[in-house]
């Protein structure tokens, strides 16, 4: 079983691609949202759980959870032996390598597996999606269509603009 962690604020087509590919590689995949009280997410935890369940509803071996604290502790508690991470660029690799090595030091029995982002998704990040939509750009193809509608509604709620 594998664990795919992230903030997923919002979920992008890059995340969805990794979820689909991870679902095909592992008999069970937990998509785990990090609860971070220091950040002010665009979407609350329950909203992100709902969105992830919605986009993964056709993947019966995928479940959605959330955690606070150390990722490797949550992985161990969940019975996951693998942490799945996506790599978009060299800069991602440098950060992810440090995290993987620290996780290995803390819990040597849990492996980290890196998947390269699909070519169509290698430039997508939640941060960029939020920036593009706030500046009035088109995010079609960057996020699942159901998420695009939610993003536009949330932006309208926050700013009065869409």
Report each predicted region and the residues it spans.
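Nucleotidyltransferase catalytic core that binds NTPs
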Residues: 1-162
